[in-house]
Amino acid sequence: MKFSVIVPVYNAEKYLHRLVESVLQQTYTEYELILVDDGSTDDSYALMKQYAKHYDQIKAYTKENTGPGMTRKCGFEKSTGDLLFFVDSDDWITNSTVLEEIHNIFIKCSTVDVLFFDREDVIGNTKEVIRGFEEIEEGFHNINEIREVIRPGLGAKILKRNILTSDMFVESKIFEDLFTTYLY
């Protein structure tokens, strides 16, 4: 199974190196890193092109500024992986075996379409673990109950490609991934 790590980039020159290096350090190597510049005014795209020039698994694209929703859509359309991992440009992956571990889960549990996991928010010197979901009792539930326990947004989730379509991405500058989350 191939991963597509999709990153919308906007004026992220100072963060991009940390993110790209954290992906390059993954022990599971069947992935592509799709970097899509959303009309940055800094040198983000130049840095992206340098990485793409040196690493075959990195692809760099640029487009006019339309916000993260359309930028993620562009990345989705350019991607070829079976598993999609949307990452913000100021994020990074702290564990070099994450893709390998996730790959193994999808191999063992082939009927899983979405994998939720915890993330750590870091603001200054403060770290907070954000759970990917809250546990609920097994059984039948109203869809609104399920929506309350699933964390919205595309971060901290791996999705099978076949559950998304291009029209699930909306043009908005903020909270655009909430819409996408509730469609799948």
Language-model regions, residue ranges each:
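Conserved nucleotide-sugar donor-binding catalytic segment
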Residues: 142-184
